[in-house]
Structure formats: structure tokens, C-alpha cells
Amino acid sequence: MRRPKKYESGEATQYISRRAALRKLQLSLNDFRRLCILKGVYPREPKHRRRAQKGSSEIKVLYHTKDIRFLLHESIVWTLRDYKIFAKKSNRDRAIKDFRNLKRRLALFPEIKLDHIVKERYPTFIDALKDLDDCLTLLFLFSTFPSLHLIPREQSNLCRRLTIEFLHYVIASKSLRKVFISIKGYYFQAEIKGQKVTWIVPHYYPFKPQSRQEVDFKVMSIFVEFYTIMLGFTNFRLFHGLNLAYPPQFPSSVLQDSEESLKDEASFVSDRIAALNFELLRTDKVQEDEEELDIDMELLEQDGDSKRIIKMKQEAQEVSRLRTLFKGLKFFINREVPREPLVILIRSFGGKVSWDSSIFAGSTYDEGDETITHQIVDRPSISTQYISRDYIQPQWVFDCVNQRQLLPTNKYFIGETLPPHLSPFVDSKRDSYIPPEEKALLDPSLIETHAQSDDDSEDEAQEEEETVDQELLDAQLQLAYQQETAEYKKYGGPDGVNEDEEDPEDEDDNEDDDEEEEELDEKTKRLQEEKQKMSVQSGKVHKVNKRQVHKAEVDEHRLQARMVKPRHRNLFRKLIREKQSKEKEEWLLRKKRRTIEASEKEARKTAKREARKEAAAAAAKASKLGK
């Protein structure tokens, strides 16, 4: 039996370098990169790099050997090789100026078909939905790009069409759950087939070309090439699940014979689809969403009353209320407000929305409509206002969705300082600082209580002080009254008669008073005895030595650090640093919050003092005038 040589088995045979993979596949680096992106093959990090690289200490890009063997049997490899042949022949035709043959070759340009790769990477529809986050974020980004050197116009238009179709599904299914505005853009989260899909829609700013090529648009364009095919399959399946016609179409009531529709019906329909403001054509007229929800509730009611079932019932009831949050409300969007995100939100929750017809096609009513309940404005003032509607800032719509209820509009009026816009995507069970506004977001019953807690505490303290002062004043008055009565009895009545010359009736009264005083003394003695019986003995205070506790914690931490394996020490140190930074950040946030609250409390106290002084001065002035 032959003795195996070194690096012929084990980890050395499990990995292959990128250069060896290029030689094995006979592809260029760009083609290999494109093939790996389309097939979902990515570099790997071995446990022992030196063994995997057969003794070499040089850092190389490594792949699994089985992944490269998997790529050998891919039909796209032949198409990529055909590209090389096509490039050589087309260059030859250009050189000899054979334009007739060149035109024929361009018509036979080899195209890559990715349908089988989508089915291969996502065997089930749920697998595709799980990987939809990055797909939607990238396609929404590319839908805002103009025609660039490495991004053709057709690709941007295709991204725009597919993302609009997906938004139509979200609106029709009412599957939107969370929203948030950040510097990056608008965060949306929808629940589709039980899977939470989160994506980002960028802000609508004019495109600014880059001076330096910091972003590799070519690699991103390859990802977009795959994701467009994937989202096309997903949209087709989602639309047919809701009995919607695909590609999206409108009912005949929308396509009325107007000059605009008769001139160019295709552009008319595409503009109305992009407006997101019309119902799409259904293959059947019955909407089964509410029926399915009722069936689910009946199934839940048939089960037991366990905590899990109760929680699921509550969540189902909240979702059913959320789906009709804006039902019966009519919104009008001003021209300075971003149209598309608000249209998605309002229509996803049952509301009606419109805008100025000069901004974009698809408006259904004008600003002068008297049935409008809310007008969304993002400017400090507006010239003409209607009494029958509320003028609110855009954040009101987002906060209502996150808190799953219609909030009061007084905090969101024109010119008002808006409340903090908190993210609903953070973990509520995390061990870190949670501001009171976020607690109110998690528990709607605390929305107003955290704002009034300081005022209530101040009022209670003030009431306690007033009651204490009143009790002291009553005690002093009672003592003074007793002293006066004693002196009165001792030195004589109103006629100047001494105690020695008193009548027998007065003597009887004095005897009665003495008896009452004796009874009071007996009561006080009895109370003192009861207090002595119920007295608590003084206990011993257990003093904690903070130095010893800190030393014990440090020793325990050092012992944990010693027990960590050498290869995991860097990871352990990294985790400790992250923990320390989180604790420091939490401490700083708490300190900042305390200073802000203390300054606000002091300002409120000074304002109250000034108000009391003014009221006292006004009362004194009024009393002088009255005299």
C-alpha cells in the first residue's frame, strides 16, 4: 500500500485557488466573476489557511473544489466562450469592412438564459421570498439611475417596471407592516406568505455622476441581470395568487375614450400604472383576502387557549385593524412632498390619495375638493387653508402606521416641532438603553404618560408641600387657641372676674374640662403603648465592599480569558470590546437624557415660579385698587 503524500488529502484537496479555477474552466477573470455571481458561488475562508494552500503562507482567494466542479457542467460556460469567438469574428469583420457580415453576426448575438439558474437556486417559492430583500433594494436603486456607461437604459427601465409591479402587489394584498425614514432612504417591510421582506427605496435626488470610480457598476449590473429574472418570476406568481392579470392591466372604467388615451394608449396605461393610484384588473370579481382572514381566525378559535394561540389571535386582530387604518380618509399631497412613498402607504391601508395633476399623471381629485380630510404639507406656512381638513406633515402618516393607530394631528401641524421619529425595526428585547419614546412606540398606552410624568411628579410634590404647610398651620392655630383659652380661664372672663371668684357653674365647667383632658391623656398613653409594642428593632446594616466585588468580577473575567482557546482569543477580545462600547454608549445616552430632562424640569419650575409671582403681584394690585 502506497503511503499518501503530504497535501494529497484533507483540507488541501477541499479548496482550490482562483488562478487554478480559471485554468480549469478556461475562462477570463471577468467571465469567471460573472459566472460565480449568477450561480451563487463565493470565496471561502478555511480554518487552516496554510494547510489549504499546501504550505504557502501567501493569502489567496480560495473556493471549494466541489463548487468549481459544479461550474464545469454549467451551460453558461459555453455561452461565455461563444462571446470570445463572437468578439474575434466581429473584430475581423470590422477590420476588413465587411459590414454585411457584421450586421448578420450582431443579429445572432449569443444571449445568456438564466431561467434554469433561478429554478436551481430557489427550488421553492418561499426560498425566493427569503432572498428578496437584496433583490428589491438593488433594483429600486438602479431604477433611479439614468443611462450610464455600464448601465444601459433598458436595464434601468426594466428595474423600474418590475419594482412598480411589486408595489402594486403590496398595495393590492395590503401586506405592508412597517415603515421608516432614514438618511439612506425609505425602509419598507411587508409580510408575504409568512415571510418578512424588507427593502429600501432611495430618496428622490437628482443623479450626481461620480468623479472617481469607487463603485464597480459592472459587478452590480451583473447582480441586477440575475435579480430582474428572479423578480419577474416572483411577480408573476404573486399576481396570480391574488387573481390579478399579469402584466398589470386596468379595467375598462379607467380606459375611457379621452384624447390622451386615444393618442397613445401604451404610454397612457404605463403612466397610470406608475401612479399607483388605480385598482388593477382582476380575473375574478370576488376579493378573497377578508374571507381568508376570517377563516384563519375561525381556525385559531377552534384551537386551545394557550399563550401562543392567544398571542397569534391578538396579532391577527391587530393586522386586520391595520389593513383598514386609513379607510374613509382622503388625502391630498402638496407638490413639495415626495409622492410615491406616501401613495404606497395610504393606499396599502385603505385610504384615498391624490395630488396636483401638473406634477404626475393619475390624480383623481383636485385640491379644492371639500371631502378631503388631510392635506400633507412640508412647508412652514400655506396661503389658503380649508377649515374642513387637517394640514399635517408627512411624518404623521409614517408614525400612524408604526403605532398601528390614528395619532392626534396637533403635534404634526404646519410649523410644529415634530416628535422623534423612531425606528420600528429595532429589537424590543435588547439589553440596551431604550428611550421613553420607543417604549411608547412598543406600548401605545404609554404614549402620553411619559410626557406627563414630570409634570405629574412636580404637581404631586407641590400638593404634598401644600398639605404639609396646611397641617403645620392648623397645628399652630390650634395651639394658639388652647393658650388663649387657658389664659382666659386663668385671669378672668370678659367682666374681669378672677378664677377665685368664679361661680359654681364655672367650677363645674372647669371640672368637665379637666375630665376631658384626662381622657385625652389616657388616649395618648394608650397610643404610645401600642407604638412601643409594634416598634421594630434596629437591624444590622450589611456593608458591601465595592472593591472586593469589583476585584472578584475582574478575577472572573481573567479566568474566562485564560480558558478561551488561542485561536478564539481575537474573537473573544472583539466581543469584549463590543460589549464595553455598548455599555459606554448606553451610559452616555442615559447621562445625556438625564441632563436634558433636568434642564427641562428646571425651566418648567422657573416658568411656574414666574407665573405665581405675576399672579400674586396682580392680586396685590387688584386688592389695592379695591381699597
UniProtKB/Swiss-Prot annotation:
Q: Does the keyword rRNA processing apply?
A: yes
InterPro entries, sorted: BRCT_dom, BRCT_dom_sf, PES
GO biological process terms on file: maturation of 5.8S rRNA from tricistronic rRNA transcript (SSU-rRNA, 5.8S rRNA, LSU-rRNA); maturation of LSU-rRNA from tricistronic rRNA transcript (SSU-rRNA, 5.8S rRNA, LSU-rRNA)
The record's annotation in PROSITE patterns points to: BRCT (PS50172)
Subcellular localization, as worded in the UniProt entry = Nucleus, Nucleolus; Nucleus, Nucleoplasm
Query: Can you list the GO cellular component terms from the UniProt entry?
Result: nucleolus; nucleoplasm; PeBoW complex; preribosome, large subunit precursor
The segments labelled Disordered in the record are 450-469, 488-566, 595-627
Q: Does the keyword Nucleus apply?
A: yes
Which sequence positions carry the modification called Phosphoserine? S453, S457
The UniProt regions of compositional bias labelled Acidic residues, in chain numbering, are 454-469, 497-521
User: Where is the sequence biased in composition, kind Basic and acidic residues?
Assistant: 522-533, 550-559, 595-615
Q: Which residues form a coiled coil?
A: 582-625
In terms of superkingdom, the source organism counts as Eukaryota
Q: Which residues form the BRCT domain?
A: 321-414
Query: Where does the record place Basic residues bias?
Result: 540-549
As one GO molecular function, the record gives: ribonucleoprotein complex binding
Pfam families membership: BRCT_2, Pescadillo_N
Main subcellular localisation: nucleus
Instruction: Provide the alphabetized UniProt keywords.
Output: Coiled coil, Nucleus, Phosphoprotein, Ribosome biogenesis, rRNA processing
The UniProt function text for this chain reads: Required for maturation of ribosomal RNAs and formation of the large ribosomal subunit.
The UniProt family comment states: Belongs to the pescadillo family.
Protein name, as recorded: Pescadillo homolog
Provenance organism = Drosophila simulans
